Amino acid sequence: MKEIFSIEKVLNSRCSCDFDGNPKKDHWGIFIKDRHPSRRILERVLRCCKKTPQFSKGKLSLWFENEYLFLGFEKTNDPFKTRLLHIESGMQQEAVYLACTALGLGTCIHNLGINGTEYTDKIATARHLILEKANSYEAGKFSTAPPGPEKPFKKGKNLSEPKRNGNVECLPELEQLTLFKNTGTQADETDISQLLWAAKGRTPHYVKSHPWGLTIPTMGGGQNYTNVYLVKDNKLFRYINWTTRFLGGHARYARYARYLSWKIGYPTHDIKPLRNVNISDHLDGADIAIILSRNEKTNRALWEVGYMLENMFLQTKSLGISYKSKVFINDEIKKLERNGISEPVAALLL
């Protein structure tokens, strides 16, 4: 029977690669030097990248230079359109990662700065190196295992455990993602749990020598560029993917808490209740929404929002649910911030 490289398996197996030969040093995957994919295979990656769904009517760009695939967009004088294009370019970047993973290839973003780099009439947001890679896991290039064993996965109290394998082939669906789908079933609690994991869930690879693997790439191994919120039944929750144990009562440790919490916690999958809200008017009438926000005013945070949107659009394909999506405008951002959601950027509406 032919192996299915399912959406969930690809999300769980995605990782960055390098040449150092040590998966626990910097990046998890290992490139095979000078082993370039065939033009036919590379065209399949580019096809997924070119099919990125767009909120804007701007021009996304891709080009090759010195063996790197550059991604970006044509400049515009409209600040909101530029914001949209940064999000969409993040979706492009993630499309490259997912396509490479599904095809058994390795890739890594060699960054162009936290806000991108100007190239004449374009803004370049990333440059990807794409090569063949060695097996990333004991079972080969794919894994359906949870994080562990060094930092074992801790089941959350409020969400069902995510599936890390499925029956829907990833690559064909990656070529036909959309911003909305009017047909399909209403998302239930299991679907919501799966979407949260797809957005920013924990996976079994290492990042910067730590078991911090995620379904999305992170610049420099950073863990807190963005937040994920859930709105359901007029309640606001924050998605939690790492248990945090603060050293209470020891003020001298306070300045180290944000570093120590990653070292002493564990990967998890849960939501934390925050407050009651009444914000469906700002969510186009939706009663359930997954809201993506940024914790810093950089473009890398917008790209990360794009990664999460790309993953959730893909995950809906195997769930068979209806959904819409949106990027918030200034008035909506202010209203949502008054309801406890800091710097909201975009949402999946269910």
Model features per residue range: what roles?
Residues 121-140, 345-350:
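C-terminal edge-of-domain segments
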Residues 291, 308-311, 316-318, 327:
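Mixed-charge, glycine-accented linear interaction segment located at domain edges/termini
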Residues 42, 46-49, 89-97, 192-200, ...:
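Short, hydrophobic/amphipathic alpha-helical packing segments
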Residues 80-88, 298-307:
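Short pre-catalytic strand/loop immediately N-terminal to key active-site residues, enriched for Gly-Thr
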Residues 106, 322:
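Residue-level detector of anion-binding/catalytic polar loops
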Residues 1-80, 112-123, 137-288, 299, ...:
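N-terminal amphipathic, basic helical "cap/leader" segment at the start of enzyme domains
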Residues 98-102, 317:
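Short hydrophobic alpha-helices that are characteristic scaffold elements of the AMP-binding
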